[in-house]
């Protein structure tokens, strides 16, 4: 698998490429399956349909890896928090974590057991996915998951979570510890089900100042990494903390790949983190609106990363209104142009 080889810094004929949110609304084939499923969560829980949309981008676009179709919030959902997705509002938890009592009723073991539909999706996908294509599992990072659990949904200010951080840090650590335990077991279960690599998404890493991030964010990611590596030392792990370009000097850990978001100059990430880590990223997603912009973006990143271990990706998820033709063009350009760079 070219993707796994790249994660492990083995020689590859070209730079492997995939896209975050590649199984998504820009694909008519995805929308057809989602319509049959009824709603987003129902699609996540129907392992046959979830597997089908996981594989779609590989077959339609020719990406080098599939990423499991699911959502980072299925873990707190199955811990016992009522979750729904409101149109125009995003995810909403019926019972946010406000007190020690709220936290106490959340069940780690129940969550890992109840997520069997995810493991079934993985097993079916690995069975039907081409042998040379990697299957990437994923989870949210503890800090990002905790923000949703405490705020009760998405937030622009993180005010409730940050108030807790500065007024009752011990309780926030308790929440993070429980979430970390659930995520660690969940990642291990995904690996047992058949994923070839795992990505940890810390979407809200950039909401914290440096000292707070390394106390309440990064340390818990490393707990997951270290525990998983103890049991599965050969499975590549990818960490994607969005918005931490100012903290790159402090990044270390027992993982293989560091995901670079589009706001971080990849040359800076290369200077700070390569070749210790394989870098993944980081084209600005809106470049996909224009083939000319795609060409320029691909050339710039390939030239910057020439000679360094690299996996090509966007610097965030693909947007719902990107033309499929442009997405195909992007994948083809990366594969063809990087072949000439090797």
From Swiss-Prot:
Show which residues form the site (Transition state stabilizer).
71
Gene3D superfamilies given for it?
3.20.20.210
Where is the protein found, in the record's own terms?
Cytoplasm
What keywords would UniProt list here? Answer: Cytoplasm, Decarboxylase, Lyase, Porphyrin biosynthesis
Q: In which pathway does it act?
A: Porphyrin-containing compound metabolism; protoporphyrin-IX biosynthesis; coproporphyrinogen-III from 5-aminolevulinate: step 4/4
Give the EC number: 4.1.1.37
One biological process term from GO is: protoporphyrinogen IX biosynthetic process from glutamate
Catalyzed chemical reaction(s):
uroporphyrinogen III + 4 H(+) = coproporphyrinogen III + 4 CO2
Q: What would be an example GO MF term here?
A: uroporphyrinogen decarboxylase activity
What CDD domains would the database entry show?
URO-D
Root EC class = lyase
Q: What is its main location?
A: cytoplasm
| HAMAP family referenced in this protein's UniProt entry, alphabetically | URO_D
Quaternary assembly: Homodimer.
The record's comment on protein family reads:
Belongs to the uroporphyrinogen decarboxylase family.
Q: What is this protein called?
A: Uroporphyrinogen decarboxylase
Species, as recorded: Campylobacter curvus (strain 525.92)
User: What does UniProt list as this organism's lineage?
Assistant: Bacteria, Pseudomonadati, Campylobacterota, Epsilonproteobacteria, Campylobacterales
